[in-house]
A protein has these predicted regions:
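N-terminal leader/signal peptides at the extreme start of proteins
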Residues: 1-8
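Extracytoplasmic beta-strand-rich oligomerization domains located immediately C-terminal to a leader/signal peptide
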Residues: 26, 30-134
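Short aromatic-glycine motifs in intrinsically disordered, low-complexity regions
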Residues: 133-147
Length: 203
């Protein structure tokens, strides 16, 4: 055995340490990149899911809108003298971002009557409120709203009319439109994203 076995020089040790540091830095940056990508994907997924939930709930409210339930039976033949039934769907919108949608729909539980639902936009958040179901008029007013969708920077709505064209409301109210188009712009981590939802055609 060679009693004078040669060891590592100081330079070799420093080079080895430097190489290990470089490898560790590359590995850390790779892990950090994966972590950031995963966080962005989770954020995008949550934003997409919240948008889908909002649109699905809106579509369900419209699908369950009242129709003949609000019409009193004509038992005495004096139909023309009876007060007109309230609109099942009432929309007010403007180019300034004003948006309010009122819906009278069937209650979630069959046999509980009708309930009022209201959607509106305030300070970049879309809210939804609903009143207690009832089988008597007047129906209870919607309670305190629940935030459904945040980050809304613009919301435009148009209605479909009998002339087969879309029309803006310019701040006016439209009752029982044939169809509703909603264009929504959100601020996300990837910038502004635009979405379009069409509900209808309504009977």
């Amino acid at each position: 055995m060679n009693k004078h076995q040669r060891g590592f020089t100081l330079l070799e040790v420093m080079v080895a340490i430097l190489l290990m540091s470089i490898v560790s830095l590359i590995a850390w940056r790779g892990l950090d990149s994966v972590t950031r990508t995963d966080a962005r994907l989770r954020e995008n997924t949550e934003q997409t899911e919240s948008l889908l939930r909002a649109f699905n709930q809106l579509e369900r409210d419209m699908a369950l809108r009242a129709s003949i339930e609000m019409q009193e039976p004509d038992l005495d033949g004096a139909q023309n003298d009876r007060p007109q039934a309230p609109a099942a769907v009432s929309l007010r919108a403007a180019d300034t971002g004003e948006f309010r949608l009122d819906v009278i729909r069937s209650a979630a539980v069959s046999g509980e009557g009708l309930q009022r639902v209201r959607w509106w936009l305030k300070d970049g958040t879309l809210y939804r409120a609903m009143g207690l179901p009832s089988d008597r008029y007047p129906l209870p007013a919607p309670k305190e709203g629940v935030a459904v969708l945040g980050g809304v920077v613009d919301l435009q709505a148009r209605i479909w009319k009998a002339d087969n064209e879309w029309h803006t409301l310019d701040g006016n109210r439209e009752n029982d439109p044939k169809g509703i188009e909603i264009r929504l712009t959100r601020e996300t981590g990837q910038g502004r994203e635009e979405y379009r939802k069409v509900v209808g055609l309504l009977d």
